[in-house]
């Protein structure tokens, strides 16, 4: 069985560490990303000390970058493992969904982004907010900043 978190799209990788890989996800929320453990395990509680340390470093970097670039107010982090159990051949893989949240509107490449659900739970079905050109600009801006720190 193929695991989508073991076979990541190389063109969307923001950062690949020794233990975790950060990829840009669909841009329904500006800067939305997925942080995926590089090894295949099914429980977050099974990560080791080195993985936990790198996780903390990546968390700090990503929060700092989104704050610097776009004035991000906060990040929602969630580890939803339940979808793996909806398949016959269950094979969960530890990964976290990162949804940045913005109190103020943000302009990127002359496109305005407003977090319409700020202060409430996110919309799982929110539409993508940016065109492909702007998504590439977002990706490059974040990746460049990530590699400078």
Residue ranges and their predicted role:
Residues 1-149:
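HIT superfamily nucleotide-processing domains
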